[in-house]
Amino acid sequence: MSYVLDSTATRHNLDAMAKFYLNYETTTYEEVAGKGVKQITFNQVNLESGSHYAAEDADITFRCYELLKEKLSQKPELEKVLSEIDLPMIKVLSEVEQNGALIDPEVLRIQSNNLGQRISGLEEKAFSEAGKEFNLASTKDLREIFFEEMNMPVMKKTPGGQPSTDESVLQDLARDYELPKILLEHRTLAKLKNTYTDSLPEQISPKTGRIHTSYLQAVTTTGRLSSADPNLQNIPIKTEEGRMIRNA
């Protein structure tokens, strides 16, 4: 209901809604259970604190529901979106999540090995281009090689006044220099390997043999679905490597 009324809001959890709609500060879970390594489970919380927390949650949930229901009743077009699209979609998405996505781990393993070989080859090319070995992930090393040893132009600086080596700078420099081009390709392949070909097989459920992502209805400002744990919607489609991962 909160999302349908305002999809641009950054948060739609109970704490945020209580603050925005009721001007009420809720008791946080950390206040009753602690945080970090010292956080306890809810069944270990003392009865008085736990009862207050649970009762407050129920009370604020009901109050927000009544208020949002009233607001929606004043906007029939949004009320229709909720009743005819968003709520029925919950059951559909639940079934999709439970069914999961069938993944072939052997295909991903082969792709991971291939990517690993290409990444190693790019590292050797980078070392050859620079005339020495260096840490491709080290901003300090890149600054030293780019701007001190190879005299590349400084395209922009960081807030701290240091020459930037972010992706936009690498893309600009790659027009005239080989090393930034190699680094961009290395980063692209390393991300594919770490995020997908290495990670996805580890997220296959041993019970179903499938990956069960979560589809989120109330996150994007445009109303489209998003995916998390893992994000299966973010696998690249424009590159050959991304399409190969999708084929798995």
Which residues fall in each region the model found?
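Conserved catalytic alpha/beta cores of large enzymes that bind or transform nucleotide phosphates
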Residues: 244-248
